Amino acid sequence: MKLIAIDLDGTLLNSKHQVSLENENALRQAQRDGIEVVVSTGRAHFDVMSIFEPLGIKTWVISANGAVIHDPEGRLYHHETIDKKRAYDILSWLESENYYYEVFTGSAIYTPQNGRELLDVELDRFRSANPEADLSVLKQAAEVQYSQSGFAYINSFQELFEADEPIDFYNILGFSFFKEKLEAGWKRYEHAEDLTLVSSAEHNFELSSRKASKGQALKRLAKQLNIPLEETAAVGDSLNDKSMLEAAGKGVAMGNAREDIKSIADAVTLTNDEHGVAHMMKHLL
């Protein structure tokens, strides 16, 4: 195996959003063995750097669900953007329907100033409708969103279209605790010919250019590095990893992955709290 593409949340990162020592050592060993380690995530590149710079590990990074590729030195290699008019229409709808949203750009993740309030209101509504429900899981899902670095806060999405410098729209995320709101997002965009629609967690949906996906980015990078796809592996847990697992020579699902991801994988490793990435590198490749 000459290249391994690795998802972050639910895969390389454990439930505490950390890279375990076992996984860290596995990455270093792979690099010593001459394997090209690639981080492939829905997160923004600068957010990935906040995790990897303290570790002193440099890799190629596929970010924003495949919309952006940076080389190990942090230089932009390739990007695919959402058409600005399309981005305006998407954000106008999300804001009018009171979604918590995130806009991934090259410089920041833009989110509403009242974003936490929007989710707090949803939590209160959810609690009222489901008094017996355990809200800790929902609160943890919200904390995953808040734990990212590089946030910039806006009063309205329209500020992004009034900026002095034009903004590249890489990825737009909608988030809700309510199934019907998530389904409304899927229904609205699932047949859009110019967009890729995926999800990286139970409570979100994410939109990027039709030319952007983790699978397409993996193919592009493998070609750039002159590595046959048969000599690549990919590991992930969520719907946004599906194209990557299908594109790679060997697709590996995490033990904590969705069942539909496990069903298309060539192998299943341990969970992200059991150092599943390290286990994969040692036993499954």
Curated annotation (Swiss-Prot):
EC numbers, comma separated: 3.1.3.-
Pfam families (UniProt xref): Hydrolase_3
InterPro entries assigned: Cof, HAD-like_sf, HAD-SF_hydro_IIB, HAD_sf
NCBIfam families the UniProt entry points to: Cof-subfamily, HAD-SF-IIB
Active site as annotated: 7 (nucleophile)
Cofactor dependency: Mg(2+)
Binding site for Mg(2+): 7, 9, 237-238
Keyword set, alphabetical order: Hydrolase, Magnesium, Metal-binding
PROSITE patterns documented for this protein: COF_1, COF_2
Organism: Bacillus subtilis (strain 168)
Gene Ontology CC annotation, any one: cytosol
Family, as annotated: Belongs to the HAD-like hydrolase superfamily. Cof family.
Protein's name in the database: Phosphatase YwpJ
General function of this protein: Catalyzes the dephosphorylation of phosphorylated 5-6 carbon sugars and monophosphate nucleotides (NMP) in vitro. To a lesser extent, dephosphorylates flavin mononucleotide (FMN) in vitro.
Gene3D superfamilies on file: 3.30.1240.10, HAD superfamily/HAD-like
Residues annotated for phosphate binding in this entry: 8, 41-42, 214, 240, 282-283
ATP-binding among keywords: no
Highest taxon of the lineage: Bacteria
Keyword Nucleotide-binding appears in the UniProt entry: no
Record-level Gene Ontology MF annotations: magnesium ion binding; phosphatase activity
